[in-house]
From Swiss-Prot:
Gene source species: Malassezia globosa (strain ATCC MYA-4612 / CBS 7966)
Region (Disordered) location: 1-64, 841-894
Biased composition, class Polar residues, residue ranges: 40-53
Lumenal side: 790-792
One function term, GO molecular function aspect: GTPase activity
Predominant localisation class: endoplasmic reticulum
Any coiled-coil regions, as ranges: 536-559
Low complexity bias: start-end ranges: 9-24
Stated name of the protein: Protein SEY1
Length: 894
């Protein structure tokens, strides 16, 4: 919004003011001090210090850039100018008639700013000397007046301060004061500022100067007199409320915001409303309330800077009110009230005293010309005061309305496309649709808005175009995102489909996919980028190209990984049979056979990889790395297979088989049938020792050919090159000493069991039944056999039994018949027990019979109640007989 007024430089170094003026006599100073001591103190902070009473204390030594927080060294002896005691130091320094001699003639006035907004500061210092204020230091005040043209502002100032501003000729109402005039009040250290009136017919709608002059008065004066007629109170334009609103708004942003950010003290100004032609019908209190309400409403409507969001009107302005009767019709009353109002500017003891310490701007008098010039330059350069005329206001209002209507129609037309874009679709006609809807909105605006102020129309059209482009930007970005995703997927599909062909070149597939995707991107974005926009697609294009290359690298890595996995499967399959066969035939060349198979498989896999990797467009370094990884993987697979074949279970089985081949079979492979004459002990010891000798052979990978060992070391690499793959030295020890001892101990137990079994076989062969025993059985049983065969009844029964047994066996009815027989036996036993119990107890059978439940298969299930009965034993032992068979008894066939 603008610089803080405190930052406006006065001068690099102001010439020291001449204090060659004769000091007042000591008796005069003492008299003035005695007179001033009877005046009530000003409303200042209780902590402020009191300055020395000598006028020399006001002599400035150097002018520095204006800032309320900068110390003006030498301005006051030993005092900080930010201290209010400089301004309210003593009655001598703040009394209007003490610093300069009394003027008996009217002072010359100075046109500070002319009607063309030109600042005249060349004669300022000369006028200060003529007015006797060049040595005033801080002992001066500034008062300005604001009001409508021809309302008696200059007359009021002349009567209050004894100035000689031009007044209007009452015979013709026309502009009198042009620009801003400055004059010293007679016998007072007051600079009075007469400001050109507002709402004059000479300037018409051009309100630029009146806003700038009002802001200048508000920013520089301690007291701003707002001159108005009584019948203007409550009006917005007539009471200058519109002007005050603009001035207050710019004053906040231009002058006060910088102070708030810097932490400086807030400057306050007194707004003294002088109500002219007051007749008393409406009490002053009511008029005062109306004005206060209007000002509070204006303050609430201002857009405040961030640092002053919570600021109140009272933080920057105090309000004062005074009334004056009609100057012509009530001349005596007017003169009397002028004297009363005059005392408020003179009498420090008056409770309504105007020039209080907190209103002073803390600018020394010798730096005032530069300060005022800097403030005016800042106001002139500020664009916030260049407000439009009525025609421009109308054009702004109507153009805004038309632009809003066009924007709504545009948004409604574009909303239908949003859903499809959000769904991830690429709209081929989006560029044409956006251009068409934007052109329609601009045409709608041009049709109605082109009739208004052309400058406003052009500016608003540009604003509308910017707004429409901003509304289209999300569609543009969403289309780019969808296009990015679609082209990435398309390129991925092209590459993946190409890799499914029997013979393909991965590099050509990648180049083809990327070229096709980038061509489609360029074609679509050429239709998508609209004229009169600053849209660029360079970043999105570079991002898409990077992602496609990343995708190609990822797909190539996937293909390489799949190739490696397939080759590892082939290695596992190719290593399984040779290694297992070599380890199943333990001899001195066992590890030679294993490592030879390992080298053969490694060479085959490396050749297969190089052949198939040629189509993947891999680099030589990548091929070397992949082959090394495959070789390490093959070493891990070999170790895995070796450990599998030398596990405790497998190795124990293999040792047992090796032992049995030598113990249970002869040299020709014929199973041995042990005879008492065989030397079992010698055969056992030889077989056992030969088998135990295999354990150290399995325990360590130790080929007879040193070249095989060296080749494995070169393939596997050093231990630090791979943390996952063990080195040859780490992996060559297959079985630990403890594991070897455990396996040997287990084998010995199994061998001992085989030895004992063989020994038992020889003993059992010696203890067989003699053959002659069978002859004895035939001789002794001959008579019984003949008796059965010769007796028709026995023979018939024998035949029936044999026939029944044959049928049962033939029909596989043995189990059901046995189950039926068992069930009948249980039933008969239960029936017998029941009959016997009935006989012994003398109770009817129905009372003691257990409930029976028949199952579909014909078996009986007993569920008996626990009925106590007498013991059946004759020994008299007390038994609690209870039928506890609560579960069904099913046939044995179940």
């Amino acid at each position: 919004m603008g610089l803080d007024v405190d930052s406006v430089p006065i001068a690099e170094a102001a010439a020291p003011s001449s204090m060659a003026a004769t000091e007042p006599p000591a008796d005069k100073i003492a008299q003035l001090d005695r007179d001033a001591s009877n005046v009530a103190p000003m409303n200042t902070d209780s902590s402020r210090e009191t300055m020395p009473t000598s006028p020399r204390a006001l002599e400035p030594a150097q002018v520095t850039p204006l800032s309320s927080d900068v110390a003006y060294e030498g301005l006051v002896q030993g005092k900080d100018p930010s201290d209010d005691s400089i301004i309210a130091a003593t009655p001598l320094q703040r009394t209007f008639s003490t610093v300069a001699p009394t003027m008996t003639t009217q002072p010359n006035r100075l046109q500070l700013i002319d009607e063309d907004q030109q600042f005249h500061g060349a004669e300022f210092n000369d006028h200060l000397k003529q007015w006797g204020l060049s040595d005033a230091g801080f002992g001066y005040d500034i008062c300005a007046v604001l009001g409508s043209q021809s309302t008696g502002k200059s007359t009021l100032l002349n009567r209050l301060f004894g100035t000689n501003f031009d007044v209007m000729d009452e015979r013709a109402r026309q502009q009198t004061t042009k620009g801003i005039w400055l004059c010293r009040g007679m016998d007072r250290n007051v600079l009075v500022m007469d400001v050109e009136g507002t709402d004059g017919r000479e300037r018409g709608e051009d309100q630029d100067f009146e806003r700038k002059s009002a802001l200048f008065s508000l920013a520089t004066a301690e007291c701003l007199i707002v001159n108005m007629w009584e019948n203007q109170v409550g009006l917005f334009q007539g009471a200058n409320m519109a002007l005050l609103k603009t001035v207050l708004d710019v004053n906040l942003s231009l002058f006060q915001a910088g102070r708030a950010r810097a932490g400086s003290a807030k400057e306050k100004t007194l707004l003294l409303f002088v109500i002219r032609d007051f007749i008393g019908t409406t009490p002053l209190a009511n008029l005062e309330a109306t004005i206060r309400t209007d000002l509070q409403r204006i303050w609430a409507s201002l857009t405040k800077p961030e640092s002053l969001v919570h600021a109140e009107l009272g933080d920057f302005f105090d309000l004062g009110f005074a009334t004056l009767p009609h100057k012509v019709l009530q001349a005596k009353e007017f003169d009397a009230d002028i004297l009363k109002l005059q005392r408020r500017f003179i009498d420090r003891g008056d409770e309504s005293y105007v020039f209080k310490t907190e209103y002073h701007k803390r600018i020394p008098i010798d730096g005032l010309p530069h300060y005022l010039e800097g403030v005016w330059e800042q106001i002139v350069q500020n664009k916030d005061l260049d407000l439009p005329t009525q025609q421009e206001l109308l054009a702004q209002f109507r153009c805004d309305e038309i632009a809003t209507t066009a924007s709504l129609a545009f948004s409604s037309a574009m909303s239908a496309l949003r859903a499809e874009l959000d769904a991830g679709h690429v709209l081929e006609s989006l560029g044409n649709d956006m251009a068409r809807h934007r052109s329609e909105a601009l045409a709608m605006f041009d049709k109605d808005a082109s009739r208004y102020h052309q400058v406003v129309y052009a500016r608003k059209r540009e604003d509308l175009l910017v707004k429409l482009n901003a509304a289209l930007l999300p569609f543009f970005l969403c289309q780019l995102k969808n296009l990015h995703n679609e082209l990435t997927d398309q390129c991925k599909r092209v590459i993946q489909e190409g890799t499914k062909q029997p013979a393909y070149n991965f590099g050509l597939l990648v180049e083809e996919g990327i070229t096709k995707a980038m061509r489609a991107f360029d074609d679509e974005t050429a239709r998508l980028v609209l004229p009169e926009t600053d849209w660029k697609v360079d970043d999105e294009r570079a991002q898409l190209l990077d992602e496609l290359h990343t995708l190609a690298r990822t797909l190539r890595a996937n293909e390489t990984r799949k190739l490696s996995i397939q080759l590892e499967k082939d290695m596992r399959r190719e290593l399984a049979d040779p290694v297992e066969l070599a380890l199943s035939q333990p001899d001195i060349s066992m590890w030679n056979n294993v490592l030879s198979a390992f080298h053969r498989v490694n060479e085959q896999v490396a050749n297969m990889y190089r052949t198939r990797a040629a189509s993947l467009n891999t680099t030589p370094d990548e091929d070397t790395t992949a082959v090394a990884q495959l070789q390490q993987a093959s070493w891990r697979l070999l170790l895995e297979k070796v450990h599998e074949q030398t596990s405790e279970t497998v190795l124990a089985s293999r040792l047992r088989g090796y032992f049995e081949d030598r113990f249970r079979y002869d040299a020709g492979g014929v199973p041995r049938v042990w005879k008492p004459s065989d030397d079992i002990d010698d055969i056992f010891v030889k077989s056992r020792d030969a088998t135990l000798a295999l354990i150290p052979l399995y325990a360590t990978i130790q080929p007879d050919d040193p070249s095989l060992q060296m080749s494995v070391v070169s393939l596997v690499g050093a231990p630090e090159e791979s943390l996952e793959t063990p080195s040859y030295d780490e992996a060559r020890h297959v079985l630990s000493e403890r594991k070897c001892a455990e396996i040997g101990q287990r084998f010995r137990r199994e061998a001992d069991a085989a030895y004992i079994e063989a020994k038992r076989g020889t003993v059992s062969s010696m203890s067989q039944v003699p053959i002659w025993m069978y002859g004895v059985l035939v001789v002794l049983g001959w008579n019984e056999a003949m008796a059965v065969l010769r007796n028709p009844v026995y023979f018939t029964l024998l035949c029936m039994v044999l026939a029944t047994a044959y049928v049962i066996w033939r029909l596989n009815l043995g189990t059901p018949v046995l189950a039926l027989a068992s069930g009948m036996t249980r039933e008969l036993r239960a029936f017998g027990e029941e009959q016997l119990r009935t006989y012994l107890d003398g109770t009817p059978p129905s009372a003691n019979r257990a409930r029976e439940y028949r199952v579909p298969s014909g078996s009986t299930a007993h569920v008996s109640e626990k009925t106590p009965h007498r013991p059946l034993t004759t020994s008299g032992a007390a038994e609690a007989d209870t039928v506890e068979d609560s579960h069904p008894r099913l046939p044995a066939s179940f």
